Amino acid sequence: MMVSMRDMLNAGVHFGHQTRYWNPKMKPFIFGSKNKVHIINLEKTMTMFNFALFELKKISLRKGKILFVGTKQSASKIIKESAILCKQFYVNHRWLGGMLTNWKTVRQSIKRLKDLESQSQDGTFNKLTKKEVLLRMRELSKLENSLGGIKEMGSLPDALFVVDADHEHIAIREANNLGISVFSIVDTNSDPDGVDFIIPGNDDAIRAVNLYLNAVSKVIKKNVKNEK
């Protein structure tokens, strides 16, 4: 699955942020500016994205776990859909501090989530008062929202695929602390430090986000299929 220059142009991948919001560390990936908006060098993006896809393919071939991270509203839905499509994992609402670095505690919360799911299906809730049922349903909903995308992960992931490096800086820092590879879309306002596989590109436009995630999920899904 190769991504072409035409695909990226059509999706608006080259449009960065307003020049006044730029991060100077992104200078090597900027082509120029137009109407006070930075234009990203798509030749570099194409090379770096296709290399990232190649590396993600290698991880999935060895049955590695890839965690998709995109908690801002514009990315939330497609992050979940893409991860499910290629049988991987996701965090698409709030990133809970310690989600990776405090995995032992997170595992206990996942166990609680699974216990509540069982209780809601095995008749346990029928034996409780309405108030107790309501409290447990609220807890279940909250846990599902936060941990639903990682409840079957079982252990720490081998890599993170992040849509917005600036917005998800806590997740990136945690991955760095644990030596987990980070693949990320990095816009002109973001700090690329801590990202192992930088993909310079627009991280706001829905069409651009769709392009990235469609390519990534297809590469991984193909390998997951080939294992069967």
Curated annotation (Swiss-Prot):
Key words, A-Z: Ribonucleoprotein, Ribosomal protein
Pfam families reported for this sequence: Ribosomal_S2 (PF00318)
GO biological process, one term: translation
GO cellular component: cytosolic small ribosomal subunit
Molecular function (Gene Ontology), one example: structural constituent of ribosome
SUPFAM superfamilies: Ribosomal protein S2
Gene3D superfamilies for this protein: Glucose-6-phosphate isomerase like protein, domain 1, Helix hairpin bin
Family: Belongs to the universal ribosomal protein uS2 family.
Protein name in UniProt: Small ribosomal subunit protein uS2
Taxonomic source organism: Buchnera aphidicola subsp. Baizongia pistaciae (strain Bp)
Underlying gene: rpsB
